[in-house]
A protein has these predicted regions:
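Disordered, acidic Ser/Thr/Pro-rich linker "stalks" and the adjacent N-terminal cap
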Residues: 1-47, 52, 62-173
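Non-cytosolic beta-sandwich-type ligand-binding/adhesion modules
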Residues: 176
């Protein structure tokens, strides 16, 4: 059994759904600063298909505990589509991934929901350098699947920014 929730900044539950194999949740209010989408799973590491926001789509991720996706506000929004986490109706779901999905030929590094704070889902990108610690230059942008590169510094042209540091290093952890 697992659940998906939308929590307020103070930890209060706004919406919750629970299930054995899959869970679907319609969150019917605008997000507020500090809100987060949570996938609660306690068990052996397991692959999930998880969608925290319908504008971003689903991700096939390895889960090793509670996964929290902070709803981005302020500067943090610059690394996301303007449609992400917007509006007053949000379709969220999670389900166990099938063996066929896990074994299929795919981009093994793709995780649209990766973030600095989210250390219980994989793949997970980290770096020793990110330009000015801006969301539009975060390590997560290297694995979010957005490939646009004809401009710079705003979504969809987000990238991993190394700030011209010759010692820059990106690490992608797959959770194994």
């Amino acid at each position: 059994m697992f659940s998906i929730k939308v929590l307020k900044a103070n930890g209060e539950t706004k919406f919750v759904g629970r299930g054995e194999e899959e869970v679907y949740l319609a969150a019917t209010s605008e997000y507020e600063e500090g809100d987060r989408v949570v996938l609660e799973y306690c068990g052996e590491p397991r692959y999930f298909v998880f969608q925290a926001d319908d504008a971003m789509g689903a991700a096939l991720i390895l889960v090793r505990g509670i996964v929290e996706v902070k709803v981005p506000f302020g500067e943090a929004r610059r690394g996301y589509s303007p449609k992400a986490f917007a509006g007053s109706c949000h379709y969220i779901y999670a389900r166990y991934a099938s063996a066929e999905e896990i074994d299929a030929y795919r981009n093994q590094a793709l995780n649209v929901y990766d973030s600095h704070e989210n250390v219980n889902s994989y793949p997970h990108a980290t770096a020793n350098v990110e330009t000015r610690n801006e969301a539009v230059f975060a390590a997560r942008n290297a694995i979010d699947g957005v490939k646009a590169n004809s401009a710079h510094g705003e979504w969809p042209y987000a990238s991993w920014g190394i700030n011209r540091n010759p010692e820059a290093c990106l690490r992608i952890d797959f959770g194994h």
